[in-house]
Amino acid sequence: MKRFVLFLLFMCVCVCVQAHADQDYFFRDFKSTDLPQKLHLDKKLSQTIQPCVQLNASKHYTSTGVREPDACTKSFKKSALMSYDLALGYLVSKNKQYGLKAIEILNAWAKELQSIDTYQSEDNINFYMPYMNMAYWFVKKAFPSPEYEDFIKRMRQYSQSALNTNHGAWGILFDVSSALALDDHALLHNSANRWQDWIFKAIDENGVIASAITRSDTSDYHGGPTKGIKGIAYTNFALLAITISGELLFENGYDLWGSGAGKRLSVAYNKVATWILNPETFPYFQPNLIGVHNNAYFIILAKHYSSPSADELLKQGDLHEDGFRLKLRSL
């Protein structure tokens, strides 16, 4: 009997190992052809990063449009995206130079940045720390950094995951990526629950994110003569974060794609795909809609859901807003 039980345990382990081997995870098993060349990583190795002691950004929008960001805000955003590219380059190529440069960037900000002094700067932490955290997740096994992990712990107070808006969607991604960077299983579990909660609260049964579709391109966020001109853009922006979060959760033990929340997400996927393919069906259609094709995240959703409209858009290939380099993933 004891031998039989041991045999069953052995078979279970074998099946689990084989299942993992057969599963091609989007990020964990990221494959790409010539990614270092396509992202000009060798040039990025020589670029100098200028971290700041404080972030003091003014509001992103004015009464007439988008404000030009200050030097420190530009540097923080550039650093986040560059560290991600370099870390992804390391993940794909195992070139240590890329991993070391990514860690150099992360540690520079961890050491220098001391204060976040405006609401807009808090927003920027919420929106860009996910790139930095994912960069660290890609390289931490080879290049662990207690300094950067302490930085994450300091910055987590600025997560906006409690909000049921695009800010909340990105806050959830901030939390998920923090959990992976810190090996914080409790935070990952809570984030999985919050992911589902956000979807049910932010996306209605028709797949519409009401807080997104009315967005204008001025500080009159949901009104004025351009009400809705960024409605599809902000829908895309929120769904991008929810999609990346969903994939990271999936790759780390929380398969929510087929859950009730996942099914609601699939409705939103098809809804926004229909709007993008036929913009005149968008409730706030107007000439010069902004950010309509910011839908590179469809590449991930297409692996889990079916949408004829999305399939057509993927076939056309006009996919933008690809800071996570999803288009470079080999099939």
Predicted regions and their residues:
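Extracellular glycan-targeting catalytic surfaces
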Residues: 20-164, 169, 173, 196-199, ...
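Hydrophobic, aromatic-enriched interface-forming segments
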Residues: 167-196
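Aromatic-anchored, glycine/proline-accented short structural segments
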Residues: 185-236, 240-241
